[in-house]
């Protein structure tokens, strides 16, 4: 049966009346186990104690207990606010679950213990950290501690620290300054896992080693396992290796899906809008022009002498191409087409009626009538108008010169046209 250290062999700092500060179920005689093999009190048998005989760790210091008694516990309202704040912080900053593995007999067997990594310092590497577990003085590591004595061992050292009496960041910083590669902080009188946070910003910036928090039962088992096997060591591992897949991060997965969906919806909206505008543009170009704006001049073939062109003052001959405007005036196609192309507006040369469109190279455009007023400054009548006026004046003069000739203006015009078109006689005949 395992032997426990008698009370008179305990250090003075450990002689605390446990029954006075603990419930009746915890009032047991405290014992002290060797931290490493070979450091047992004289006269002890070389037997490894069981976990049932492990001493309960000493609770918080008397100073903190006195402060609690003096200041009192927080009020229920403040406690509720504190609980809500802790819940919010836990949602915003959830640490990754890690594992403390006790490796026995040259990696032949191992025991895992659950823990929580600290929210400060460097995170655990995927391959983990190996080292021999050691206890130091003071056990709470609130003051500078002793450096580890490894001798010829190939692995580093991992320190086991008791909770309370100071902040977590100070404990881990003292372990780092002593030369330990990692720190394990265990709970006291509880098996709950606590997320370790920092208090002092300047201390947090100096911490460069990882640290984890374990329960009280895990610390007791680690003492027994690692204290009874010389080749046993501790291995701090992250529970899950780092995952770069979106399936490991639900929030990122949902955000990615929502982002892709929104991008597809916006793209589809722009594409449909562009197609709709393109379809409207095509329909507008294919709409038929109104009947009132697409009146075209009629083209006919002249078959008999019945009139003359008001532009060139030549009679129509058989086979000439004539163009009849909407106002029923007829012109040569070779005369009216250049007229339309050079005139500032498309209108009949005689009656000035607007022509919406023609059949040969003209658009159905109606021009303004502001230039039709001859009284406007800068107005110059066209050549054909001057020729018409001169021709009318000549006919009038011919009619006055022959008072005994009872001929109409039409007959005089025809006679004048015949005379003017006859070839001149040669002299001397």
Curated annotation (Swiss-Prot):
E.C. no: 2.3.2.27
Glycosylation site residues: 107, 152, 229
Gene Ontology annotations of biological process type: negative regulation of cell cycle; negative regulation of nucleotide-binding oligomerization domain containing 2 signaling pathway; proteasome-mediated ubiquitin-dependent protein catabolic process; protein ubiquitination; ubiquitin-dependent protein catabolic process
Major site of localization recorded for this protein: endoplasmic reticulum
Superkingdom of the source species: Eukaryota
UniProt keyword Nucleotide-binding, yes or no: no
Pfam families given in the database record: PA, zf-RING_2
Side Cytoplasmic, residues: 272-429
Zinc finger residue extent: RING-type: 309-352
Domain spans labelled PA: 151-223
Membrane topology: Single-pass type I membrane protein
Keywords assigned by UniProt, alphabetized: Endoplasmic reticulum, Glycoprotein, Membrane, Metal-binding, Signal, Transferase, Transmembrane, Transmembrane helix, Zinc, Zinc-finger
One Gene Ontology molecular-function label: zinc ion binding
Record field: catalytic activity: S-ubiquitinyl-[E2 ubiquitin-conjugating enzyme]-L-cysteine + [acceptor protein]-L-lysine = [E2 ubiquitin-conjugating enzyme]-L-cysteine + N(6)-ubiquitinyl-[acceptor protein]-L-lysine
GO cellular component assignments: cytoplasm; endoplasmic reticulum; endoplasmic reticulum membrane
Sequence ranges of Basic residues compositional bias: 37-49
Broadest EC class assigned to this enzyme: transferase
Annotated segments matching region Disordered: 30-67
Segments on the Lumenal face: 28-250
Signal sequence segment: 1-27
Pathway(s) served: Protein modification; protein ubiquitination
Free-text domain note: The RING-type zinc finger is involved in CANX ubiquitination and degradation, but is not required for interaction with CANX.
Subunit structure of this chain's protein: Interacts with CANX.
Listed PANTHER family: OS02G0798600 PROTEIN (PTHR47168:SF1), RING ZINC FINGER DOMAIN SUPERFAMILY PROTEIN-RELATED (PTHR47168)
Purpose of the protein: E3 ubiquitin-protein ligase that acts as a negative regulator of NOD2 signaling by mediating ubiquitination and degradation of RIPK2. Also catalyzes ubiquitination and proteasomal degradation of CANX within the endoplasmic reticulum. Could have a role in spermatogenesis.
Name recorded for this polypeptide: E3 ubiquitin-protein ligase ZNRF4
Species of the source: Homo sapiens
Gene that produces this protein: ZNRF4
